[in-house]
Amino acid sequence: MISKVIKDKIDIDKILIVTFTNAAASEMRERILDAIYKQIDENPEDEALQKQIILLNKASICTIHSFCLDVIRNHFYELDIPANFRVGDTGEIELLKQDVIEELFEEKYLNNDKEFIKLINTYTNYRDDESLKELIITIYKFIQSSPFPKEWIEEKVKMFKIDDITDDFSGTIWGKILLESLSEDVKDCIIRLENLAKEMKKFDELEKYIKVIQNDTYELQSLLNNLNTWDSAYNHSNIEWMKWPVDRKVTIELKDEAKKIRDDIKKKISSSINKVLLYNSEAANNDIKEMYSILNSLKNLILEFSDRFKYKKREKNIIDFNDIEHFALELLVKKDDKGNLISTEIANEYKEKFEEIAIDEYQDSNLVQEYILRSISKGNNIFMVGDVKQSIYKFRQARPELFLEKYEKYSIDKEQGRDLKIKLFKNFRSRQNILDFTNLVFDNIMTKEIGDILYDKDEYLNLGANYEPPENIKSVYAGITNLEIIDLKEDDDDEEENDSSKSIEKNESDEPIVL
């Protein structure tokens, strides 16, 4: 973005730079200011650069919440909120939530609300109702990361609605997920059995044991072939395991190892079947139908809490951090006649204002923020910076998949004339040995299934700084990755603690671990 100001001559107040923290915003301002001053030193007559010093004071370099708050303050009259609204502090907001939930529960008790009493019987331990209160507030907080919380929760609860309990359960999303999970377990065990049989065939003495393994494979393959429908899977879920032969004359070590592997497979399959295929379709559908009734009541209670909480905030002229994003979304996004999301007139004003939009730490954005920033962009003027490996805010409903979707879709080829991806793989903070170790670990543990990204040589970190060669450093650790394992687990056993201390002392005196 600095080059946009200096090289492309874009006024700094025509650029929106969204950072994750206020500190990052301040740092960005300083970096831009330093870069401008450096250019002025080289080109003291450049009036355009001097102009940027003045414009920097009103430049939009801020967090997403600061930007949204600015949108709200400039258009509060569209939201039916007073001009003197304020953002409530965390403690005040939490106390208000507790007041609202207490009042709501008290009213439900007084009215002997049947749906409410059913929820009490389902989610509490009969001593108090705190667990249900906590559940309502937790779900309420969770759905605020959705652009449209009410629609989201109604859609999710509707997934539990069963129209005909006689339909095969595999037709539901729940049945599909469970059968897919069981199928993966069965496939894994079949591969293990086939590999085991291949090894055992090297020994003629293991022929009768091989027959058992082959029978196991046949039984599991039969189950796998019947996992296309629920009732078919249920009817074939009784695996007939052959008895393992006992022959003391066979002393080959692989025999005992094979039995251990087989026992582990039997345990895994039995556990998977008992977790998944508990009932036939009708019974499973009945369970989901009963769950729908309960979840629908829970949804209604959450939405009622949401409405009351919103009313209480209006009474006190306060908004919270979730309101900041949702009010901005309300001002910037609307649905057309076909239900498609489009930019409002207010959003179009911001489109005209900003020539470029830059988003830092994009991997930690949520869907509300995505809709907001997309609504004010021209479509091809957003610059996103992120690293999915640094995504640590999923518990706050960050959506790293937004980053991954673009990472997979965008091209590194400028000539293709479409959305461009620039890979930043040079690391300026670490020496080569640290990078080698990091690449080694990530290469082995990060896959599409675990970590959402395939960490291969195209993703490796590369040395970017010029460090002094290890041979010139007078240290035993030069060029070596020293791996220190710190066990923070508390242990009440004094004897074990003493043993652990001795072990740590020994490790500290040993040579570093070379990797």
Model regions and ranges:
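Helicase-core coupling region on the C-terminal RecA-like lobe
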Residues: 125-138, 144, 152, 423-515
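Conserved helicase NTPase motor core
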Residues: 16-18, 24-25, 60-61, 85-94, ...
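AAA+ P-loop NTPase catalytic core and its hallmark functional loops
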Residues: 110, 371-374, 390-391, 447, ...
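P-loop NTPase Walker
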Residues: 1-80, 312, 316-322, 330, ...
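Short, polar/flexible loop-turn hinges at active-site or ligand-entry regions and domain interfaces
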Residues: 8-13, 37-58, 75-92, 103-118, ...
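Conserved ATP-driven helicase/translocase motor core recognized via long
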Residues: 14, 134-319, 418-419, 509, ...
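Alpha-helical scaffold elements adjacent to nucleotide-binding pockets in ATP/GTP-utilizing enzyme cores
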Residues: 1, 27-35, 67-74, 96-104, ...
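Core structural elements
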Residues: 56-69, 121-145, 298-304, 319-332, ...
